[in-house]
């Protein structure tokens, strides 16, 4: 809601209290350097969630690549053709494993999908959806049936994850995790209070949930639409939940209470937390404290849309509502931390003009 007494001054920055965790640690979201900050002043900058949006593998805060060439996947609808574009089509293709790029080879034709679809299906079924004869692509389409000038039934040909368990091994960082970690190292980890104590000592190692469980699809392949559990809870059911069911999705520094994959105790909000604070899917609300006037990321994967080969992550729009965006979009980044239950409030009343200040015991 429109909370006015959740301002905290910590480590030279302003934060907003999101909630009190079960162990009395306090979850905070970055809110700039002044209580008057708004828009892009409330984030540490912008970032893509990841540089690839064509594969659900990369919706992980971390992920793992166990990839293989797949050229006989389930037929699916593809709705991302442009009806007036002249695409090239061929009767064969090659794949470069080093660059992970497909290329058209052999005999080729070109034309709009509407004008050449019969000849394509019969003799030249492969396309990169490129207007260049030598264009390359990260996935290929085998055209199977004409649906409309901008859509077709296709087989995806991909170099992609072999199964769902593989992507949960969490060996590689997302783009946004790299940005958050770099910021934290400079501005919290390597920064000290007036007593020479690192500000990281004030923090508690709590779970950041990158919930990759799903309610439909398979969570890893390009040929199936996947709806992740966070989407089902918050969009279809409107029943947010703070439980993180899958150990691999519980991002923590220590493996005592999570996956032990974080370098630093910092992450992002989930859309469940946004919903509990007052955010609603596609319903404008610029009156609650998480609405800043700048769109910014959560760490909740929501949908992989096989009809467009787009992976979507949850975010808060400039107007304050919960929405989704492709993972390659550049949105604001607002780090989230947890103050230790051992800290003491040393001043302030949490209001805009008098934010809380905190200290460690005997410090």
PLM features: what roles do these ranges have?
Residues 1-363:
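Long, domain-scale functional regions
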